[in-house]
Amino acid sequence: MIRMEHLNHHGNLYAGQGIEWMIENSFIVINCEYGDPQGLLYKNTHKFDFYSSVNPGDIVYYEGLIVRTGKTSITIRVGLYDEKTDILRAEGFTTFVSVDPKTGKPVPHGIVLDEPADEEEVRWREEADSYFKKK
């Protein structure tokens, strides 16, 4: 539930708070797959876009899915949804890197993605790939 301490000066969910929760959700999703929280290191938030205001008293939930893997990187698409309507209110992508907990150096994670479940997941994967194309 969105409380007063989560708000910005406009009276809506503060983006920094939304991003913090998005990163936490991403970490939980990856940790469930990878299994070693000590071996995960946050690398980047690629975007976090609001599609509608999130207001005090709104009940929301985050839903994340791994949409891209590199040798050591793992990218998650996270959506922020309205609990009552399931309407997407915001979304973003974050990337973590698998590391050796003792050395902090990147190590292969071994995560292999299944085939996309639907066209929406295909779009999410394509968007995630676009963040890694050399410009």
Predicted region positions:
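Short, residue-level hotspots on alpha-helical faces of the histone-fold
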Residues: E20-E24, I28
